[in-house]
Amino acid sequence: EDVPSDGIVSGGTTADSNTTKFPAFTGKDLDGNDVSSDKLFSGNAFTVVNFWFTTCKPCVGELGDLDALHKEAAGKGGAVVGINAFTLGGDAGAIADAKDVLTKSGATYQNVYFDADSEAGKFTENVYAYPTTYVVDRNGNIVGDPIVGAITGDGQMEALQALIDTALANDKG
């Protein structure tokens, strides 16, 4: 295994040479309810974390597929969560716009935001392509590599499903 000398892999912090932690956060969902990464991740065998923004056509185009995945995931002890980059810091206009897009797309899964200066906020700002989707296990570890690009693309959903299957196989909760 090639782990960089600083022990940092893909923007998170490492628990050991094989795992990368998703940055911990406390924030709110788009309805103003408190959300913490600890409770979110520990409550699910896997969490699909999708980074998107409101004016990104491929991002908006996959919201329906992500909602269908969320409904399917619930039966397997998992969830889908969205992080809209425009809502970092709790900008009221951006939150209203995101809620409008989600409603029009029929997406009912939770979307969260947090302080832009937090570790998770910095992680979000370092996402270089949208949409980008991560799978996080019950312990807050990122599973495999992120899916870059819409999950509606060729092979993307299969790759995402493989990460979910890995998280489920490794779940010790």
Regions found by a protein language model. Name each.
Residues 24-47, 71-72:
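A short beta-strand-turn-helix
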Residues 60-104, 116-121:
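Structural microenvironment flanking redox-active thiols in thiol-disulfide oxidoreductases
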Residues 42-47, 74-81, 105-110, 138-141:
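Loop/turn elements at helix/coil->beta-strand transitions in domains of secreted/extracellular proteins
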Residues 97-139, 147:
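Short, internal strand/loop/helix patches
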Residues 135-173:
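Thiol-/selenol-based redox modules, centered on thioredoxin-like
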Residues 53-58, 85-90, 115-120, 129, ...:
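Solvent-exposed loop/turn segments at secondary-structure junctions
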Residues 1-26, 41-44, 96-100:
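N-proximal helix/coil linker or "cap" segments that precede and/or mark the start of modular domains
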Residues 36-60, 66, 79-84:
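Short active-site neighborhood of thiol/selenol oxidoreductases, capturing the structured segment around
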